[in-house]
Amino acid sequence: MVQSAPASEIAALILRGFDAYREQFREITDGARARFEQAQWQEAQRASAQRINLYEEKVAETVAGLRAGLADSELLDVERWPIIKSAYIAQIDLRLDDELAETWFNSIFCGLFSHDNISDGTMFVHTTRPSLRAHARAPYTRTYRPGGDLRQALEKIFDDYRFDVPYDDRERDLERIDALLHSNLPDWVCKDPDLAIELIGSVFYRNKGAYLVGRLFTPDEQWPLVFPLLHREGHGIQFDTVITDEAEVSIIFSFTRSYFMVDVPVPAELVAFLKRLLPGKHLAELYTSIGFYKQGKSEFYRALINHLATTDDRFVMAPGVRGMVMSVFTLPGFNTVFKIIKDRFNPSKSVDHATVIQKYQLVKNHDRVGRLADTQQFADFRFPVSKFEPECLAELLEVAPSTVVVEGDVVLIRHCWTERRMTPLNIYLENASEAQTREALNDYGLAIKQLAAANIFPGDMLLKNFGVTRHGRVVFYDYDEICYLTEVNFRYIPEPRFPEDEMSSEPWYSVGPNDVFPEEFPRFLFVDLDQRRLFAKLHGNLYDAKYWQGLQQQIREGKVIDVFPYRRQETPEQLLK
């Protein structure tokens, strides 16, 4: 039975939904330690997907509860929502996750209203929370002061971060990490009496790895510090390496990786700490990396509207070959592309709009192994017409008139995805040196292999569908033909029956909808003969159906293959010689 409710009660109902979401989020996250200790790798993948889907499930549940308990005339009176927002602000004021609570409020509002009603009066378009709150914080880091004895500090770290599974070889790992730190850092650092090591108290879990994250610092300098840990089944926990290079740590927190599972009592505090380690990362990316992808979306949107308000930047079509399914535009000064689905696809494409959306959701939920760009989905973006170059707007209106609409002096984009901008691999290779070409083509092959190991087949593997990041990594970003590797039927081309068969424009053999012939890859992927020959030397096994069938067999047997987000260093024996 519907009834009247004061604004404070509606605010409390919204907050109750948020509490239910946060409780279940923490429950899934807290299970990461046990999954790591028990080597439950498939369960870890399922938990990751479950946590991603949790947000929308709980928003829908909360919206349904509000609709069931309140009259539409009361709930959908937009004039009341500034009062509800004020009541909500008072209720979240002392929370340690208040910025997440604001984003939750926005999600509930958008679940009830069309985007026509968005304003800072009814929603948190801009946050009301200061970036650093003055109230008490829970202690979040552990600090170690070697005082010239780095080995002793490392022993204390090993003691403080114990698991219910023993270390495989504690003494070996201590020697290795000590040697690596002396090797990676300037000579004077490890001897500096003022050197300190600060580590986040919570362990970061993802896929088959666990990570201790922090920094080394002196009064004048600092270095990021990451200890990756592995659980070798039947052997125990081992410290795999140590990373102190900012670029390598940045890759571990990349937009191409799955989200970490990490206990986060105070999200803003953890993000601020990570920002000090990785100043090149935007807040949006850091929130997203620790599982708060909706907060990442809020931070991204705020950065976008600020950029548009404070610069003369205008939208242009993204460089590269025009897509058959998606149209892509960008802001030159904002490191993002915006992707919309065209109204009509090239006849060679067999997908429809619903399938494309499903493919993007598949990527969102799957382990991206550092080779798939994360995306954010937006509805009803509104931008001034003046922020578009005329040629860009004309092309968008031509290819997607059902998605892009001009309403007076505003451009409405009904649906789009945002994605990190990269240099298309085909364009990168046009200007690459011989060494850069070799490195890029090698990484291109590694990207395909690592995706395959994660049960992902890109489908359309043309160079134009891969991008090169600022760190030089090759990443796949065209998802309309992506599928699970185990769905593909890899075949050898049958021998021709007659000499005439080889001259025919049509195949002399039947081809099913999921059939793929790796022998055709060289001609299909490379027009440039030098690149074709080089790739055959680097990754020729990709042209053999047996290679793909072998991976499929391992996946069907339940094996989760190792893909490391960092360069693995020398063995202890090599390093300690």
Swiss-Prot record:
HAMAP family: AceK. Its EC number is 2.7.11.5, 3.1.3.-. Belongs to the AceK family. It is found in: Cytoplasm. Coiled coil: none annotated. The active site is at D374. Pfam families: AceK_kinase, AceK_regulatory. The keyword Glycoprotein does not apply. This is Isocitrate dehydrogenase kinase/phosphatase. One of its GO terms (molecular function) is ATP binding. GO terms for cellular component: cytoplasm. Bifunctional enzyme which can phosphorylate or dephosphorylate isocitrate dehydrogenase (IDH) on a specific serine residue. This is a regulatory mechanism which enables bacteria to bypass the Krebs cycle via the glyoxylate shunt in response to the source of carbon. When bacteria are grown on glucose, IDH is fully active and unphosphorylated, but when grown on acetate or ethanol, the activity of IDH declines drastically concomitant with its phosphorylation. GO terms for biological process: glucose metabolic process; glyoxylate cycle; tricarboxylic acid cycle.
